[in-house]
């Protein structure tokens, strides 16, 4: 996780969720704002990536695939990173399902958040102009017997190699460059993330999406 926003991630999440009321032939129907956005095939990945959040995102993607396998899914990311296994469950589902998953960075996409941002469908990875992106190597700390520490150290090196391989594929950078740039926290602006290959387009207005998709 990035120390850049560590203090903010410790704050309790906002419990007040806005409700949206729609008029239907059967009368009024109320949705929380996230359920309403899900109807528009929009999913939010916000905060630290952990198992419960990952399960919810996977379930939403599978639901939207079952509802319409031809329409894109839009994954909005504002995350400081989190647990690798949780993030990889989201990543694998993104690659597994039939619909394209378009990724949009709002705020920040750090660590696993940046990895998932880069994993969006080709030519459908976006970043808002003042968002920040950060890539680095996996973090891990272990306690116990020396033999157990050695086992975990070997495992995290395997995970690091696998994530670097995948990042090289999605960014079209060489593995050597990825290994060098992720050795320490590597922050990028929206434009720098575009040049690096983490996103395809920096959006300033809604119409930018349509204009870019026509290219």
Swiss-Prot record:
It is found in: Cytoplasm. Cleaves peptides in various proteins in a process that requires ATP hydrolysis. Has a chymotrypsin-like activity. Plays a major role in the degradation of misfolded proteins. Fourteen ClpP subunits assemble into 2 heptameric rings which stack back to back to give a disk-like structure with a central cavity, resembling the structure of eukaryotic proteasomes. GO terms for cellular component: cytoplasm; endopeptidase Clp complex. One of its GO terms (biological process) is protein quality control for misfolded or incompletely synthesized proteins. This is ATP-dependent Clp protease proteolytic subunit. It is an enzyme of class 3 (hydrolase). Belongs to the peptidase S14 family. It comes from the Bacteria. The active site is at 111 (nucleophile), 136. CDD domains: S14_ClpP_2 (cd07017). Keywords: Cytoplasm, Hydrolase, Protease, Serine protease. The gene is clpP.
